[in-house]
A protein has these predicted regions:
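Active-/binding-site microenvironments in catalytic and ligand-binding cores
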Residues: 2-273
Length: 273
């Protein structure tokens, strides 16, 4: 992105017609350059990249009390010669990171999460069949042990994700929030025992869910949050496409936000499979 001063300097050199012509033909000029680039090669042993991130838009459900993202154009190509938007959102919006400081005062903020914890072996624990029948189901410690019986011990430093299939409801806010007659939401999460096992016995880097919360949506106390974040680990909420990732063998890349003092923030999350 060119700074406004750079754009203005170009304007002074070129006539407006020339300037617009350069902009209009920019894509055509770039085609030969792209054609000369070498094809992207994945790290050895990986065959695909899966995007685990929802598109952040005003229509995406957000946790009650938070505001949907707002995007306001500040400048446009037609008017100023370059485009720029002002974006406003709560940190915990869309596919986003929960830093330890989100629940623990003085703990690590998102900008200070060690970078070697943002690249990790990905463990996917699937409870989609149970969740389809019981929205309040939890990932239990036994679910984790059963996973280990099939795939081996959860590696130290791994990122453990719950695949409940809840991301399939994201376009239907009523279904996604799943409120009962009293207004209580219902969606899966991690049990306290599972969270404790992961942070005290497996030393994971982080824990993720495809729902709005690490805890079950109906939880009155945030025990999973407190257990995970209280141990200095981070969480990622509102993941998607976990159905396309194998239970074991993939690697996750968490593009955590880095604004100073962040309690969390939208993230681009990828899986190498």
């Amino acid at each position: 992105m060119c700074a406004p001063s750079v754009v203005e300097s170009v304007r002074r050199t070129l006539s407006r017609r020339q300037f617009v012509g350069v902009v209009a033909t920019g894509a055509a000029v770039s085609v030969p350059v792209r054609a000369q680039q070498k094809p992207i090669r994945l790290p050895k042993g990986f065959r695909d990249v899966i995007d685990l991130t929802h598109v952040l838009s005003p229509l995406l459900p957000v946790y009650p009390g938070y505001r949907p993202i707002q995007v306001r154009p500040r400048s446009t190509v037609a008017r100023e010669g370059y485009a720029n938007n002002e974006v406003t959102f709560d940190e915990h919006t869309g596919t986003h990171v929960d830093a330890p400081v989100h629940f623990v005062s003085g703990a690590v903020s998102a900008d200070r999460v060690p970078v070697d914890r943002l690249l990790a072996p990905l463990v996917v624990v699937t409870i989609a069949e149970r969740a389809a029948k019981n929205a309040d189901t939890l990932v239990s410690a036994d679910d984790l042990l059963q996973w280990e019986k099939r795939y081996g011990r959860i590696p130290a430093g791994a990122f453990v994700a719950m695949h409940s299939g809840w991301d399939a409801h994201v376009r239907d806010a009523n279904r996604f929030f799943n409120r009962d007659a009293k207004g209580t939401m219902h969606a899966p999460g991690f049990s306290e025992a599972a969270a404790r096992l992961l942070v005290t016995e497996r030393d994971v880097s982080g824990v993720g869910v495809d729902t709005l919360s690490l805890d079950a949506a109906s939880a009155q106390k945030f025990v999973a949050h407190l257990t995970i974040l209280g141990a200095g680990k981070y969480g990622v909420e509102m993941l998607t496409n976990l159905s396309r990732v194998p239970p074991a063998g993939a690697t996750i890349i968490v593009g955590a936000p880095k604004h100073e003092g962040a309690t969390g923030g939208p993230a681009r999350v990828l899986a190498l499979v």
